Regions:
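Structural and coupling elements of P-loop NTPases
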Residues: 1-375, 379
Length: 383
């Protein structure tokens, strides 16, 4: 799991919760500190804050510095080389002087790696430097076992040091195939072990739903076992309905690319599933199992919808129904007494996002105001 932290605002409550959730679920964790090219960024202060909030596993691997002319550069502590970026392209530069910090960072990283293996610990205390292979293997083992939380930095907007982040995500984070198994349950509530292999019957978890105005509903899947292929019938463990898979897709940003299939351990997307919702498990009929579904918070703020353009009332209902497929925390109802259309969400910001999505995705403009007779409003029912 990658936790993102701003180089200006530091460790937010959301970042802290994400880290704790990853730890609770035994997930390997990596941190990326962005916006390090900005004038008021303070990486080393944030690093100390992370050590307090995330614990002693925090281990910096790439740190920012500046050249004499103020150009931001990034020091790779693995290779002990520095790089600047022009148009997203990496250019090696002379290692800048960051004082006593440099040697301290190298020693801290070496000590963290040494703690992953007895032989490495002996080598560390003997004053012998680690080989590149030992550094990579020790770091990988430490990340997998939760002993090391590598910290990288850069600028996401200006494409600085992202190459080092992506390379090390590939090298250091464990593959899903490294997990012994994932527990699901069958129709009788009995535990079933799912292994990350294409040899087992297919089981895929719907982790996200997107309302696409062009292709319709797009369901994002993580394939736990087996392989999702075009034309394959899969059973929805929640409803018992059979979904026929259209073309599996690989999603790269906004681009959707046709794929031959989505194998165990991979994620992808499928369009136009009928019954599938976020949290559902789609399985081969020979082994119907269910992954634990998330528990979503209930709406806490309800507001009346006003139509900006006459005649859009009908469009609002259908557009909101589409948005509710991708956002289970959103609700919609018609108040029979006041004849108002009411939407419910988690707060003002949430409803503002819904308002913007209605306009951008479906061309429907609405206004929001306080509803009438809130005391008589019944519990919302989802479409």
């Amino acid at each position: 799991m990658l936790v993102c932290v701003s180089g200006r605002s530091g460790v937010t409550v959301g970042a802290e919760k994400a880290f704790q959730l990853a730890r609770k679920n035994g997930k390997a964790t990596m941190v990326f500190v962005s916006k390090c090219d900005l004038e008021n960024a303070n990486y080393f202060k944030i690093l100390e804050d992370m050590k307090i909030k995330f614990g002693s596993t925090v281990c910096p691997c790439v740190v920012p510095a500046k050249l004499d002319d103020g150009t931001p550069v990034y020091i790779n502590l693995f290779s002990q080389k520095a790089f600047k970026y022009e148009g997203g392209k990496q250019i090696q530069v002379e290692l800048p002087d960051i004082g006593h910090r440099f040697q301290g960072l190298i020693e801290a990283m070496s000590e963290a790696i040494a703690e992953t293996d007895d032989e490495l610990m002996e080598k560390f205390f003997g004053g012998e430097p680690f080989t590149t292979e030992e550094i990579v293997e020790g770091m990988r083992k430490g990340v997998k076992d939760g002993l090391i939380t590598p910290v990288f930095c850069g600028s996401a907007v200006n494409l600085q040091a992202l190459d080092m982040l992506l390379y090390n995500m590939h090298k250091l984070l464990p593959s899903p195939a490294h997990d012994a198994f994932i527990l699901a349950e069958n129709a009788n509530g009995e535990p079933v072990e799912l292994h990350c292999t294409e040899e087992e019957p297919t089981a895929a978890y719907v982790f996200k739903t997107v309302a696409d105005p062009f292709v319709g509903k797009l369901s994002y899947l993580r394939v736990i076992s087996g392989k999702v292929t075009a034309g394959e019938p899969l059973t929805n463990a929640r409803t018992g309905e059979v979904e026929k898979i259209s073309k599996p897709l690989t999603v790269i940003g906004k681009k959707q690319v046709d794929a031959d299939g989505i194998g165990a351990g991979d994620i992808g997307a499928v369009a136009k599933l009928v019954s599938a919702k976020t949290g559902d498990t789609l399985c081969d009929a020979s082994r119907v199992v269910k992954m634990p579904a998330p528990v979503f918070p209930l709406p806490s703020l309800f507001m009346a919808v006003t139509v900006a353009k006459k005649g859009d009332e009908g469009k609002i209902s259908s557009a909101l129904a589409r948005l509710m497929e991708e956002d289970p925390t959103l609700s919609y109802l018609n108040n029979a007494e006041t004849h108002q259309q009411i939407i419910g969400g988690l707060g003002e910001q949430h409803l503002d996002v819904v308002k913007a999505k209605l306009k951008n995705k479906f061309g429907v403009e609405i206004g929001l105001r306080s509803e009438e007779h809130t005391s008589e409003l019944q519990s919302p029912t989802n479409l």
